[in-house]
Structure formats: structure tokens, C-alpha cells
Amino acid sequence: MAAVVAKREGPPFISEAAVRGNAAVLDYCRTSVSALSGATAGILGLTGLYGFIFYLLASVLLSLLLILKAGRRWNKYFKSRRPLFTGGLIGGLFTYVLFWTFLYGMVHVY
């Protein structure tokens, strides 16, 4: 008779260290893109609402690229898709505004 192997019911095993590492990579990507897009917005001279729309477009583009990179097996790397869209969004906004105002002042004011 063949041995019966019982399948484990419940959620798959997830390494907490790997989850933290992936979150750190997402945070690094979001911070880098925020700094780069803020510098770009400052050099282009975007002001007011146009500057914030530029940040929104850069964030959406980054999220789409992250989803494309994760592929169909995103659940192998993340618990949910939400961190790909919203992870580090507010912290990235602060970085964006910092670089945006600094480079706008350097290029267009001085």
C-alpha cells in the first residue's frame, strides 16, 4: 500500500526576515524614485498642483514597474499586493518635496 502524505492546511510558511528584506528594498526603491522625480520636477520648474501630479505619476509608474518585476508569483515575495502600491508613499512624498524645493530654488531662484 502507498503511504498517504497529508497536505498541510493553512497559510504557507513565510520567512519574516525575507518579508522585512523585501520591504526594505521597496522602501529604497520608493525613496530613490522620489528623490529623482523631485529633482526632475525642480529642474523642470513645476509648481503647485503640477508638481504633486508629477509625484503621483512617478509613484504610479514605480508601482507598475514593481508589479511587472514581481510577476505572477508576487505572493512568493510579499504577503499582499498593497505594499507594492502604497508602501512608503508618504515618506516618499516628504523626500520628493525636499528635492523638488531644493532644486527649484537652485535652478530658478538663484
Swiss-Prot record:
Described purpose of this protein according to its UniProt entry: Part of the endoplasmic reticulum membrane protein complex (EMC) that enables the energy-independent insertion into endoplasmic reticulum membranes of newly synthesized membrane proteins. Preferentially accommodates proteins with transmembrane domains that are weakly hydrophobic or contain destabilizing features such as charged and aromatic residues. Involved in the cotranslational insertion of multi-pass membrane proteins in which stop-transfer membrane-anchor sequences become ER membrane spanning helices.
Protein location: Endoplasmic reticulum membrane
Residue positions where N-acetylalanine is found in the record: 2
Membrane topology category: Multi-pass membrane protein
TM ranges: 29-44, 51-71, 90-106
GO process annotations (BP): autophagosome assembly; protein insertion into ER membrane by stop-transfer membrane-anchor sequence; tail-anchored membrane protein insertion into ER membrane
Residue pairs linked by disulfide bridges in the UniProt entry: none
Name listed for the protein in its UniProt record: ER membrane protein complex subunit 6
Topological domain spans for side Cytoplasmic: 2-28, 72-89
Subunit structure: Component of the ER membrane protein complex (EMC).
Family, similarity comment: Belongs to the EMC6 family.
Principal subcellular localization: endoplasmic reticulum
Lineage: Eukaryota, Metazoa, Chordata, Craniata, Vertebrata
Organism: Homo sapiens (Human)
GO cellular component term of the entry, any: EMC complex
Keyword Endoplasmic reticulum: yes
